Amino acid sequence: MFKRFSICYILFMFCITGTSAQEDRWTGNAANLSKGNLRVNSSGRYLEYSDGTPFLYIGDTAWELISRLNDKETELYLENRREKGFTVIQTVILDELDDMDVSSNGEPKLIDGNIDKPAPGYFTHVDKVISLAAAKGLYIALLPT
């Protein structure tokens, strides 16, 4: 009898605490960018800020974030991830899947599809996404393609 009651009580408490923990949204920046740049700790085992404070890498992978989402969608996505406590967004500049020609904003990514001729408008958009992430305290783990 006591065992059954204990199990029920534990399950009930688990449900209560799990539900209440999901009510509060994160209100601050995801990471404290004022602590300096990131570097590998001298032990080689983890990342830290330049002031020596350990950095917790909680990443979300959005490979085609830059090329698929427009400005409004990007703002919503980054805000959603900031609220959830992510610290890093992993993405690429040039996606390899469907088309590499045009971004979601309708701008070409490359001039004449030539990798040696980046389109200035698209790369202004790339800079904007990175700046928006930084304003929210999110780091961007960026791959070229």
Model-identified regions with their sequence ranges:
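Active-site mouth of glycoside hydrolases
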Residues: 26-145
